[in-house]
């Protein structure tokens, strides 16, 4: 009998948002298990509500973070040790047993997923990569010279299992690998059933305070990357006024540094940004970021044209350690081919100030430090 059961693995709130959307669209006729990991701390809190929806046959919790950290950059004998006795390791990590699956959907090529590829090493089980922000569009994770784990017999096994990747905008892909890019259906903002389902899972509450200018933080501090993003936040706060400026913290950053520095009040929810776009009227707010793909999801996921200010021309530092040049191509391609009329990329801090004022920022003189902000160095993402 043909096995039609699938497994979806989620490591972040954005992945969970997309996994629920996939289950109600392209996977509607298939029985599915959901595996929620501890990569993002808040994810486990959604498990009771996920179970109550009955959307998935089984909701499994996996403690994969520590194991991933141990083996992500490992080599040789250490990797041999990690991939030995995969069945025992999986029983130790997961609170429920896995079933037999025809397809496994995942977003990250972490050691855990690579171990699953070894566990389900048979032609009848396909591994399918799905959207996880710009990294899915620009990084060839399986290139042999990218990481030692790709050259390991077990760690590289997943290369034989993956043939395609599901993206909201396949034509944006620039990875340079041989995977087939296929389209995920965009989310229909008029789909009330999906909206109610996601609101229940994430316990979404309508913001009580104004969210006129929202800065989407990125995971630079979690990855140890030195940048000027906090200085850029301060510039934006001065341009629009503290009461109208809010920073959405990145869930992987260990501390809410912008809040600690007084750059923002507390962000009101841990639900994915996409759920705010789904529920509210984002046409009346402005999204600001260095280059977070979340700022592009209004266009990529929903087909909307929301005020968006991208600060990557003012940014100091590297966003990606190895694929920064490809990321620049991705951002240029998005701007040329996909961006709407309300998409802005300021070249100078003075242009940034003018754009924010045009979009409704305050018109009184700003703090002097704005005008004396140092020029961006040659390391900027151009």
Model features per residue range: what roles?
Residues 320-382:
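Leloir-type glycosyltransferase catalytic cores
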Residues 7-153, 295:
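Active-site and donor-binding regions of nucleotide-sugar-utilizing enzymes
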Residues 199-202, 208-253:
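Conserved catalytic-core segment of nucleotide-activated headgroup transferases in glycan assembly
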Residues 251-296, 300-301:
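Donor nucleotide-activated moiety binding/catalytic core segment of transferases
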Residues 131-214:
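A nucleotide-sugar donor-handling region in carbohydrate enzymes
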Residues 48-62, 124-126, 144-148, 245, ...:
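Active-site regions of enzymes building and remodeling cell-envelope glycoconjugates
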Residues 60-69, 108-110, 127-134, 210-221, ...:
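Short loop/turn segments at strand-loop or loop-helix junctions that form parts
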């Amino acid at each position: 009998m043909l096995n039609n059961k699938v497994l979806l693995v989620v490591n972040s709130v954005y992945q969970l948002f997309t996994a629920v959307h996939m289950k109600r669209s392209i996977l509607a006729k298939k029985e599915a298990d959901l595996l929620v990991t501890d990569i993002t701390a808040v994810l486990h809190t959604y498990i009771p509500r996920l179970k109550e929806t009955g959307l998935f046959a089984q909701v499994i919790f996996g403690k994969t973070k520590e194991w991933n950290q141990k083996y992500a950059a490992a080599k040789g004998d250490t990797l041999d040790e990690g991939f030995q006795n995969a069945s025992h390791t999986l029983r130790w990590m997961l609170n429920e047993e896995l079933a037999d699956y025809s397809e496994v959907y995942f977003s990250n090529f972490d050691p855990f997923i690579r171990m699953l590829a070894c566990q389900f090493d048979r032609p009848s089980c396909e591994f399918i990569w799905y959207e996880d922000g710009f990294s899915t569009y620009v990084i060839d994770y399986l290139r042999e010279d990218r990481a030692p784990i790709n050259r390991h017999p077990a760690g590289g096994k997943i290369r034989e299992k993956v043939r395609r990747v599901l993206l909201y905008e396949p034509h944006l892909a620039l990875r340079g690998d041989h995977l087939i890019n296929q389209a995920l259906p965009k989310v229909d903002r008029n789909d009330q059933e999906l909206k109610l389902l996601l609101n229940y899972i994430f316990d979404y509450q309508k913001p009580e305070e104004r969210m006129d200018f929202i800065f989407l933080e990125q995971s630079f501090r979690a990855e140890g990357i030195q940048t000027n993003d906090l200085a850029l936040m301060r510039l934006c706060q001065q341009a629009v006024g503290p009461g109208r400026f809010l920073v959405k913290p990145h869930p992987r950053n260990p501390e809410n540094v912008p809040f600690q520095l007084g750059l923002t009040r507390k962000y009101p929810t841990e639900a994915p940004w996409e759920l705010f776009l789904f529920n509210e009227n984002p046409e009346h707010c402005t999204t600001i970021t260095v280059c977070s793909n979340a700022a592009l999801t209004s266009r990529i996921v929903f087909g909307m044209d929301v005020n968006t200010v991208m600060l990557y021309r003012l940014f100091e530092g590297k966003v990606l350690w190895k694929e920064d040049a490809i990321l620049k191509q991705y951002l240029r391609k998005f701007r040329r081919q996909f961006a709407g009329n309300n998409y802005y990329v300021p070249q100078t801090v003075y242009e940034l100030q003018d754009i924010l004022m045009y979009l409704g920022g305050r018109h009184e003189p700003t703090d002097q430090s704005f005008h004396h902000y140092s020029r961006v160095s040659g390391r900027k993402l151009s």
